[in-house]
């Protein structure tokens, strides 16, 4: 049985940082969670807490496909959002693979709001750096992450905290939970129904195949 431990928002950051400090060299961290769980905020706080260890946050939505591709079936096709919006090949090519090989990372490819390519400058990171990729529905894709964190919301909390204009993603998030089982894939699960009083559930069994 997985041990669940109550903590604080600062305690969540400390737990993630401890996982990273246990690994030498360059580390690729993913913080996965529905937008309502705000994985980007946790990613930013982890980057700040890692200092002076170099770290860079990459938002997964800055690696979405162009609108002409991802919106082929409409603006609110939840299955396309789950399976097709993320440009996995670009994320591998510009971030995950070169970071390990050379330390070079392109922090963003496209502005998810304007759909325009961004003029990001390639960043050269040292051998002990951490790249933090934050976003939704990122696990179970076979992407090469070294440390995995999933921020979990119960179905009730997810419905309550998801803005009305994003409610069309709820069926996809349900399918993601059922089919990809992100909790079983994560090194650390953050139970965040109460953002002031979260809980931690470290993994106690080997993860399923990617």
Predicted regions and their residues:
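Hydrophobic/aromatic beta-strand patches that form the interior of the parallel beta-sheet core
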Residues: 29, 56-58, 132, 147-149, ...
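ATP-dependent NMP and nucleoside kinases share a basic, alpha-helical "lid"
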Residues: 115-162
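Glycine-rich phosphate-binding P-loop
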Residues: 30-48
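Flexible active-site lid/hinge loop adjacent to a nucleotide/diphosphate
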Residues: 157-173
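NTP-dependent small-molecule kinase module
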Residues: 1-23, 146-147, 151, 156, ...
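Pre-Walker A (Motif I) flank of P-loop NTPase domains
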Residues: 24-29, 128
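Conserved nucleotide-sensing/catalytic segment adjacent to the nucleotide-binding pocket
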Residues: 59, 64-115
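Post-Walker A helix-loop "phosphate-sensing" segment adjacent to the P-loop in P-loop NTPases
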Residues: 47-57
């Amino acid at each position: 049985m997985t041990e669940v431990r109550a903590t604080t928002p600062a305690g969540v950051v400390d737990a993630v940082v401890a996982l990273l400090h246990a690994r030498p060299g360059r580390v690729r961290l993913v913080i996965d969670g529905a937008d309502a769980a705000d994985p980007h905020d946790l990613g930013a706080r982890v980057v700040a807490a890692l200092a002076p260890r170099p770290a860079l946050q990459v938002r997964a939505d800055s690696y979405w496909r162009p609108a002409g591709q991802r919106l082929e079936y409409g603006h609110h096709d939840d299955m396309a959002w789950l399976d097709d919006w993320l440009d996995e090949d670009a994320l591998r090519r510009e971030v995950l693979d070169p970071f390990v090989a050379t330390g070079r990372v392109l922090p963003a490819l496209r502005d998810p709001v304007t759909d325009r390519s961004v003029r990001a400058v390639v960043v050269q990171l040292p051998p002990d750096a951490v790249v933090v990729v934050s976003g939704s529905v990122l696990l179970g894709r076979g992407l090469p992450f070294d440390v995995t964190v999933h921020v979990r919301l119960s179905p009730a909390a997810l419905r309550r905290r998801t803005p009305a204009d994003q409610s069309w993603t709820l069926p996809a998030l349900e399918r993601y939970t059922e089919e990809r089982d992100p909790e079983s894939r994560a090194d650390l699960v953050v139970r965040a129904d109460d953002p002031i009083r979260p809980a931690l559930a470290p993994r106690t069994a080997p993860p399923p195949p990617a």
